[in-house]
A protein has these predicted regions:
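Generic recognition of stable, solvent-exposed alpha-helical segments in well-folded globular domains
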Residues: 1, 5-8, 12, 54, ...
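Residue-level signal for well-ordered alpha-helical positions
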Residues: 13-16, 88, 147, 166-167
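Active-site diphosphate/adenylate-binding microenvironment
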Residues: 34-117
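Short, hinge-like loop/turn segments at secondary-structure boundaries
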Residues: 91-94, 169-173
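Thiamine diphosphate
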Residues: 83-161
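Single conserved hydrophobic/aromatic residue that forms the stacking wall/gate
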Residues: 175-178, 182-183
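Active-site-proximal loop->helix
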Residues: 142, 163-171
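Glycine-rich, acidic loop regions that bind phosphate or pyrophosphate groups
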Residues: 1-32
Length: 183
């Protein structure tokens, strides 16, 4: 084991690596990633919006372009919209995309967005939500209003718990399937 002060140990390791002339071997890996992205894109350009149809991937791309990358925070609720937001909203700074990850904590996003707005009052805060997850804590709109917190909320309404449908469909749990959540 290496025992020592982290700053000194890392400086020593970096110096030894530089003296040895070691170079990262990332070129083949980056080429592989580029090939995968070409073959298996997140987004198919043939998905076109038309009257009566909204393509969630396009919504996220448009939102991403509207946000100031240096002075905005995106917080997600939990569901399919969370995946689209993670894939299509560009962020330049750390801690400007807040999500509960894979924890499945529906209702996390809006209160977290309110907290982010309190923590960074000069930044624009947007909560990306689905109709199912937003209803878990929609009462927090009162908290935001009472405290004058200017959080914006984008709700994608598919009238269902979309991710529940998505994962029940492959195993044919038709009798257990989540149905409409909002009128």
């Amino acid at each position: 084991p290496i025992v020592g002060d982290l700053r000194g140990v890392l400086a020593g390791i970096n110096e030894a690596v530089a003296k040895a002339g070691a170079k990262p071997i990332t070129a083949p890996w980056l080429a592989q990633i580029a090939e995968w992205r070409r073959r298996f894109p997140f987004y198919h350009s043939d998905l076109v919006e038309d009257p009566g149809r909204i393509v969630p991937e396009t919504v996220m791309q448009k939102l991403s372009r509207k946000l100031d990358p240096k002075h905005s925070i995106v917080v997600t609720e939990v569901g399919q919209h969370q995946m689209w937001a993670a894939q299509f909203i560009d962020r330049e700074k750390p801690r400007t995309f807040i999500s509960s990850g894979g924890l499945g904590t529906m209702g996390f996003g809006f209160p977290a967005a309110i907290g982010a707005a309190f923590g960074r009052p000069d930044d624009q805060v947007v909560c990306v939500a689905g109709d199912g997850s937003f209803q878990m804590n929609s009462q927090e709109m009162a908290t935001a209003a009472i405290n004058g917190v200017p959080v914006k909320v984008l709700i994608l309404d598919n009238r269902a718990l979309g991710m529940v449908h998505q994962w029940q469909k492959p195993v044919s749990y038709t009798h257990l399937r989540a149905h409409e959540t909002c009128a």
